[in-house]
Amino acid sequence: MSKRTNNKKRKHSEYEKELEPENQDENQDEEFLEDKNKDKNQNKNKDKNKNKDMNKNKNKDMNKNNNKNNNKKKKENGNENVLNSQFYKNIKENRQITDIFKTLVECINEKIESLEDEENNNQDNENFIYICEKLREQFIKIYEKEIIEYKLFREIQALTIVKERELYDILKECDKRLALFRDHQSNCLKAKCDVESQMLSIERKEELNEYLYYDNDSIPENSNSTTTTTKKSKKKTKASFLTLVGKANFNTNFPSNFDRLFSISCERD
């Protein structure tokens, strides 16, 4: 019996040993799956946080835009400066006071009515009624004054807005006229330059004509000395003509044709 049991035990242990790597693989798979799930959860949380941040930023941008639009509207209506002005603050305070005055006047009216209804009107009651009426008059005056001031303030505000618009239109018109004047000035300068260049070219042409077609009276009557004088005059004229050509800044093709032109002009003489 003991042998059998030992054999059984040995077989069982061997079987367990064989199963061990399989169990290890299973455990590893489970661990891997757990890690995967953890990563997934982490990614989900990250995405959630990202979305939260995105929504926060969107809300911030929305609030910024709303504030900008509100400020623009305030500026357009001309209320921004008004709200910050001392005058408007005074009106606000006065309005609060007038509200108190209103309630006081109502209370006084009620009191006067109740006193008037009483049968036993003594001197104290009459005095009190008189004081209340005087107070009521004062309150009404203050209230009316506040209304007039507020109306004046609104009129001034409207006037300033109109004047600002008029000033803006005038400035725009000034800019337009200035641009037109600058264009006109540049056109005048161009025209002036063109005229000056034309005048210069005419002067140069006249000078060239003078050198090309010089007078025959400069040649002496003595026939023997004619050839020598003409040669000299030709040389002089040629030299002076070349200097003139240099001044006139003609193109490079002109000097090559110069001898031919010069000889023709001399033959003509």
UniProtKB/Swiss-Prot annotation:
Q: Where is this region: Disordered?
A: 1-82
Query: Which residue intervals are annotated with compositional bias (Basic and acidic residues) in the record?
Result: 34-63
Basic residues bias: start-end ranges: 1-12
| Sequence ranges of Acidic residues compositional bias | 21-33
The superkingdom of the source organism is Eukaryota
Name of the protein in question:
Uncharacterized protein DDB_G0291143
Lineage here is: Eukaryota, Amoebozoa, Evosea, Eumycetozoa, Dictyostelia
